[in-house]
């Protein structure tokens, strides 16, 4: 008897020690997700507002817990249960119960989304062995137009609901595959008319703030622009040759970037178990296809899979996870060009196609760019100025501006969480090789070289190469009032030491060059995924 009591006491002490060591998780978003205890087990309580009453509500929850999954845990990974039944008003929250795996402690919430819109984002566990669980739930809900609370159930409706089958809930539900759809010609490469601009504008109009689009719904259908409407807009801008004559020598002809001005910009994140980290940029070219660089997903012995990658569309400020009209798009597949070899120094065929699980709805902030059309010969674009846009994050997920500011006293950090846009004059290989002989080994007949024409204020304020962290970003050239994707960023010239003895930090030379994968050389391969 005494031995039995001692064994029980040891088990109790062990459980208490584990609880103190691990600690009970705290909800990262207590307004929409809370941990509850019913006396026997822990569960999660989630409140979600349906973003669109005409579509099924698709809930996705990603959980993180310490250790390897046990046999008992593998048999039951948890589930999402719809708590509130009956009809809902559009503004009323829908309540869900998150049942956790049979484990001593509830897992931490890593990500929660509704119809691909991230509504809660947290950090995972920190341990040598980690287990991630993804739960999904899809249900078509009935909505009523009146303002009665959805939590006050109709007794007759409740009786009907009791006879219904259990709501479909499975840890790994299969998405219904939709056919790939090429971007409509009316949309691709065009910007909402309220945000549209040409590469070169009159200097006096550069500092006029561009307002947000006058749309009350961030996920409405796009505004189509007919060919004859371009003539109506043309009088607002001047020809590039005319604009260059009145530009100042400080290269300040680029407008301040606003949200929605580059709606095909994609932010690609990778799941590193404990957090989502920014990895690369990308370019949306259809409702399901994003183009990026191969080295973003395959470098030496590391290869990211589709389950480890999440693509954000419609994003501008990467610190703001709740931007209207943006969405988090799960990835169905990552296809790296078969000729790409991460073990070699050459960046030949450094291109990848990311296929999204679901087609995205185009809106003011999410639109595709056009794939290149016309000749694929590089010599035909030498001398032209393209546009490169992307976020300049390094691999530690700090912006290069912030990193420099922490190292240099008196330097103020600029907001590099927003994308930066720069001009990229396309040059021949000879000029590129003269700038840096190492580019000869990096390039091939399927790459081209372009410079970075930085604005003076960026060069002096940031004092660092803010343009070398934009792997996967696209280089766009305007053709017939449309922006066309011609290249993706592969390799940049390393920063050089400044001759100024007082400044020991590295500066990006004003005439920096970057190697791009020539998208025009891979159109046949890309089109196979788009059609």
Curated annotation (Swiss-Prot):
InterPro entries: GD_N, Peptidase_S1_PA, Peptidase_S1_PA_chymotrypsin, Trypsin_dom. Residues 155-174 are annotated as: Disordered. Its main location: secreted. Pfam families: GD_N, Trypsin. One of its GO terms (molecular function) is serine-type endopeptidase activity. Residues 246-531 form the Peptidase S1 domain. GO terms for cellular component: extracellular region; perivitelline space. Disulfide bonds join 280-296, 432-449. Keywords: Developmental protein, Disulfide bond, Glycoprotein, Hydrolase, Protease, Secreted, Serine protease, Signal, Zymogen. GO terms for biological process: dorsal/ventral axis specification; dorsal/ventral pattern formation; proteolysis; Toll receptor ligand protein activation cascade; ventral furrow formation; zymogen activation. The active site is at residues 295, 350, 471. Coiled coil: none annotated. Expression begins in previtellogenic stages and is seen in germline-derived nurse cells of the germarium. Expression continues throughout oogenesis with transcripts from the nurse cells accumulating in the oocytes. Most abundant in the ovaries, the level of protein decreases from the moment of egg laying and is essentially gone by 4 hours. Residues 1-19 form the signal peptide. Glycans are attached at residues 272, 397, 445. It is found in: Secreted. The keyword Hydrolase applies. Proteolytically activated by the protease ndl. PROSITE patterns: TRYPSIN_DOM (PS50240). Its EC number is 3.4.21.-. Belongs to the peptidase S1 family. Component of the extracellular signaling pathway that establishes the dorsal-ventral pathway of the embryo. A protease cascade involving ndl, gd, snk and ea results in activation of the spz Toll receptor ligand; acts downstream of ndl but upstream of snk and ea. Activation of ea requires activation of the ndl-gd-snk protease cascade and sulfation of a vitelline membrane component by pip. Localized activation of the Toll receptor in the ventral region of the embryo defines cell identities along the dorsal-ventral continuum. This is Serine protease gd. It comes from Drosophila melanogaster (Fruit fly).
């Amino acid at each position: 008897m005494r031995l039995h009591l001692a064994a029980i006491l040891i088990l109790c002490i062990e459980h208490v020690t584990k609880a103190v060591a691990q600690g009970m998780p705290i909800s990262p978003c207590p307004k929409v997700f809370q941990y509850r205890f019913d006396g026997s087990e822990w569960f999660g309580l989630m409140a979600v507002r349906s973003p669109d009453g005409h579509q099924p509500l698709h809930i996705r929850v990603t959980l993180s817990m310490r250790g390897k999954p046990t046999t008992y845990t593998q048999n039951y990974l948890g589930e999402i249960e719809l708590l509130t039944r009956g009809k809902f008003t559009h503004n009323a929250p829908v309540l869900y119960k998150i049942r956790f795996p049979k484990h001593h402690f509830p897992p931490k919430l890593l990500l929660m989304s509704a119809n691909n819109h991230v509504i809660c984002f947290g950090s995972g566990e920190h341990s040598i062995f980690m287990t991630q669980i993804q739960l999904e739930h899809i249900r078509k809900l009935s909505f009523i137009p009146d303002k009665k609370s959805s939590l006050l159930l109709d007794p007759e409706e409740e009786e009907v609901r009791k006879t219904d089958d259990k709501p479909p809930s499975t840890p790994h539900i299969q998405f219904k595959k939709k056919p790939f759809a090429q971007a409509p010609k009316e949309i691709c490469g065009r910007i909402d008319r309220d945000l549209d601009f040409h590469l070169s504008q009159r200097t006096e109009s550069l500092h006029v703030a561009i307002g947000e689009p006058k749309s009350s719904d961030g996920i409405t259908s796009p505004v189509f622009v007919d060919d004859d409407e371009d003539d109506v807009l043309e009088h607002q801008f001047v020809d590039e040759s005319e604009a260059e004559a009145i530009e100042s020598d400080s290269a300040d002809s680029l407008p301040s970037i606003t949200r929605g001005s580059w709606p095909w910009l994609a932010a690609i994140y990778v799941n590193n178990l404990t957090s989502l980290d920014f990895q690369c940029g990308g370019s949306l070219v259809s409702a399901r296809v994003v183009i990026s660089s191969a080295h973003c997903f395959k470098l030496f012995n590391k290869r990211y899979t589709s389950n480890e990658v999440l693509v954000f569309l419609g994003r501008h400020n990467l610190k703001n996870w709740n931007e209207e009209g943006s969405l988090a798009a799960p990835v169905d597949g990552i296809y790296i060009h078969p000729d790409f070899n991460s073990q070699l120094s050459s960046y030949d065929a450094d291109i990848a196609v990311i296929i999204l699980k679901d087609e995205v709805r185009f809106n003011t902030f999410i639109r595709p760019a056009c794939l290149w059309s016309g000749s694929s010969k590089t010599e035909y674009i030498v001398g032209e100025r393209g546009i490169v846009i992307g976020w300049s994050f390094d691999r530690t997920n700090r912006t290069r501006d912030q990193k420099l500011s922490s190292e240099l006293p008196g330097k103020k950090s600029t907001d590099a969480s927003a994308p930066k846009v720069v001009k990229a004059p396309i040059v021949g290989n000879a000029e590129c090789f003269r700038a840096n002989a190492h580019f000869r080994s990096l390039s091939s007949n399927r790459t081209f070289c372009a410079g970075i024409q930085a604005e003076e204020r960026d060069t002096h304020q940031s004092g660092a190469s803010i343009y070398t962290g934009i792997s996967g970003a696209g280089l766009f050239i305007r053709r017939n009032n449309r922006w066309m994707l011609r290249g993706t960023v592969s390799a940049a010239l390393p920063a050089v030491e400044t001759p100024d003895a007082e400044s020991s930090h590295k500066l990006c030379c004003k005439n920096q060059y970057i190697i791009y994968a020539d998208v025009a050389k891979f159109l046949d391969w890309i089109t196979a995924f788009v059609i």
